[in-house]
């Protein structure tokens, strides 16, 4: 769900690549003191924090991801009986002049407090995709690269996907143990070099960044 929930702040703020990531996640036990470890599947719940370098003249931006039933604190501007997001989740963007809340897929963007929405008429500036993104994708393939205007071209979707994978990278590193089996050196703030696509302060995490493909299946990147 990361692509659907992180897309609104990623697109509107123009985040780019994160420079650091850290996380915490739940543990499950099959008996006393023996935690289950299933590194190839997601945890029951997790919390991830990323930092994005600020644009010229603007501060850095922190992005917080929560799942598995973990929710952020309710904004003070939101009434006690007003819904936060929607049934599947949502996003809250906090700026210097206020907050905006939306549901999953960016549905129903709302200024907070919600009273600020009264009488508000925001003009539509982004092109809509009435045929749906499946048809848009097929039409773009038929037309050829660069011929059609897309709502999520590779130039945008690539950095967005890399951002979400940074969260997975932190989660995979979280339970790496040292030689004693008692310490977890990956439970730190991981520093990301986006140009060279590597973690600079915990080399063991880089095993999850790239892989060696079988002969004949190598990617051209």
Predicted regions: what is each one?
Residues 1-153, 159-221:
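Glycine-rich, aromatic-lined ligand/substrate-binding cores of catalytic
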């Amino acid at each position: 769900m990361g692509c659907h929930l992180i897309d609104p702040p990623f697109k509107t703020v123009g985040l780019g690549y994160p420079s650091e990531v850290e996380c915490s996640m739940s543990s499950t036990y099959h008996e006393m003191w023996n935690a289950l470890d299933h590194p190839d599947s997601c945890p029951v719940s997790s919390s991830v924090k990323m930092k994005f370098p600020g644009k010229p003249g603007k501060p850095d931006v922190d992005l917080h991801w929560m799942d598995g039933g973990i929710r952020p604190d309710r904004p003070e501007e939101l009434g006690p009986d007003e819904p936060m997001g929607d049934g599947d989740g949502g996003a809250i963007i906090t700026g210097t002049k206020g907050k905006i809340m939306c549901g999953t897929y960016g549905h129903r963007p709302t200024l907070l407090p919600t009273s600020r929405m009264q009488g508000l008429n925001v003009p539509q500036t982004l092109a809509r995709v009435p045929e749906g993104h499946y048809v848009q994708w097929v039409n773009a393939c038929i037309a050829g690269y660069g011929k059609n205007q897309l709502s999520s071209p590779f130039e945008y979707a690539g950095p967005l996907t890399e951002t979400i994978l940074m969260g997975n990278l932190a989660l995979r590193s979280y339970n790496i143990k040292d030689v004693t089996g008692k310490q977890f050196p990956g439970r730190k703030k991981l520093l990301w070099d986006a140009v060279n696509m590597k973690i600079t302060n915990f080399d063991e995490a880089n095993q999850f960044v790239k892989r060696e493909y079988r002969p004949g299946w190598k990617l051209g990147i």
